[in-house]
Amino acid sequence: MELKLDETLQKGIEAYGNGQVPEAERLFDQILISQPYHPDANHKMGVLAFGEGRMQEALAYFKIALEADSDMGEYWLNYIDALLELDKLDDAKAIFDQARLKGAKGEAFDLIGKRLSEPNVS
């Protein structure tokens, strides 16, 4: 079963990379039907929703992905970006602090940390 899920995830990633968003969404959703808390599938669905401007939906997917696997820095960064898109600066700062406490680090986190500390962040 896990191999089939991995294959489906890879096909979804390829479809997304080829601009086939509806097919990618269908494949990721197929994974979530059998494993609703699958971190990668939730994250990818969040990325799709974010790309289409559905920020509340993206937040929900990113949150589930983080709850399932809080070690993935990309999940934290995308969650923070979605919060900023919704002008939820205080929430974004709180999530950033949580990410740092979990050990998140690197250039991308340094950049978003600077962004969060600037006046008039958006």
Regions found by a protein language model. Give the residues of each.
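TPR alpha-solenoid repeat register
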Residues: 41, 75, 108-109
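Structural signature of tandem alpha-helical TPR/SEL1-like repeats
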Residues: 2-6, 16-29, 51-64, 86-100, ...
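Canonical tetratricopeptide repeat
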Residues: 44, 78, 111-115
